[in-house]
Amino acid sequence: ALISQAEEESLYFKLIEQVNKDFALANEPLDAPTSIFPFEFKNLVQEKIYKLIHYKFAEYLNLLYIIDVPEEQIKKLDGSDLVELSEQVAFLVLQREWQKVWFRNKY
């Protein structure tokens, strides 16, 4: 729903650019092409987050800090299943990045 709203408001490309920018700032480039389909984009973000949680936890925390995902939202998640956790974190990351893009466009 979040990505379809971005598409409706013609901000999908800006969302991809923002995500790419913040992942690059965290020294964990995502390099998602602006031509990527929304479903693939969500999966790419989720896969990258899964790998960070599993293999590079410090970099994962740095990424959350750079993107400014609220810590209390992360603490509410159940970390027992890494695949599910990465899916939930990917949603929070995309949600926060969408807020940035939307506010920048509106104001």
Enumerate the language-model features and the residues they cover.
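Amphipathic protein-protein interaction modules
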Residues: 46-87
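Amphipathic alpha-helical binding modules
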Residues: 76-107
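Conserved phosphate/pyrophosphate-binding and hydrolysis machinery centered on Walker-type P-loop NTPases
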Residues: 5, 9, 31-39, 79-83
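Solvent-exposed aromatic/hydrophobic patches embedded in short alpha-helical segments
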Residues: 7-11, 68-69, 89, 93-98
